[in-house]
Amino acid sequence: MAKRAYHNYWVYILTNKPNGTLYIGVTGGIDDRMERHIKGEGSKFTAKYKLKMLVYYEEFQYIDDAIAREKQLKNWHRQWKINLIEEHNPKWENLWKGDAETSSA
């Protein structure tokens, strides 16, 4: 079966501070998903640890590719994930600018 692209998909990593707790997720709408995480509605895990900083993301055309990458990252050792973040975002800055509130942990 041929792959169909509906829209773009994202694999993303959230945290609450540099080198803090990490959460890896996949979504078809990064803005909506981040707003839900900020409100504590994204997932119980992100709400519990107040994971509101988007520190890494990758964009995919196909959902199957995004899900495969999410699974791959979830199976990585923690240090590999940290290295990936620091390679692309060495200052651990919040990459989501949808709300000024999210710029602080």
Give a label for each model feature.
Residues M1-S43, A47-E59, D64-K71, H88-P90, ...:
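GIY-YIG nuclease catalytic motif and its immediate N-terminal context
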Residues K44, K71-L84:
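Short arginine-rich
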